Amino acid sequence: MPTVRGCSLPDELLYDVENNIWYRPNDDGTVTLGMTAVAAAMAGQLVAFTAKKAGRKVQEGKSCATVESGKWVGPAKIAFDAEVVEVNDALTATPKLANSDPYGQGWMVKVKPADWAAAKGRLTPGSAVAGPYEAKMAADAFAGCAA
């Protein structure tokens, strides 16, 4: 698993580095997504998570959820057109799951992509994500995830 400045980035996932979102394709044609460890560390302890409701269509570059910490409120932008099919109610109830387990219990939503083949081509595979994340962290002056 790639680690950049102490932040884990599992190589079986796909990444939208610019928006700090990871994507995991599922066998049923849906895609699970969430905040990266980088995003969780930058935001600090999350205090609120509000997702678009199941059945909502979300356009590329638009918010599929809003996350809030003590120092930041912002959108979780999706990298492709999709329909929200499931919301992680556990994350809504306990937002800090995104900090403690960003790639497991801290997932945000599951979506049905309009065109997964095209969308997948715009994402960075985990095996190639270390370089782009190092550059982004340097540009953002982010020292890294706490040990």
Task: Go through the PLM ranges and name each one.
Residues K52-V67, I78, E83:
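Short, well-structured beta-strand-loop connectors
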